[in-house]
């Protein structure tokens, strides 16, 4: 009987985590996908692709500072937590191989 509360807690955590990822994807599509496209490919050279190396850029303080100044980011109606979730979504969805090992 003690397993039931643990199982319920695990299910609740999984659902909450899934909602967070879904929200980040929706926010990406609403605030970034119009220019960078749903698959992150962008429209080079005007709109850079998010595929490939941006994970290396986000690892640098200057890269994160630049990312915060992109018009869709700096003018988005997202709070800091939602914005961080969108950036994390973009990095893991489009750049998993280029991310630093300690990326969370």
Describe each PLM feature range.
Residues 1-2:
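N-terminal secretory signal peptides that target proteins for export/translocation
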Residues 5-15:
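Bacterial N-terminal signal peptides
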Residues 16-19, 58, 78, 101-104:
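Short coil/turn linker and secondary-structure boundary residues
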Residues 19-41, 59:
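Sequence/structural segment immediately N-terminal to covalent heme-attachment motifs in c-type
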Residues 31-34, 38, 53, 66-73, ...:
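Structured segments of extracytoplasmic/periplasmic soluble domains
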Residues 41-76:
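Gly/Gly-Pro-rich "capping" loops immediately C-terminal to redox-active cysteine motifs
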Residues 60, 64, 68, 80-91:
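An amphipathic alpha-helix signature
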Residues 81, 92-104:
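Flexible coil segments in periplasmic/lumen-exposed cytochrome c-class electron-transfer proteins
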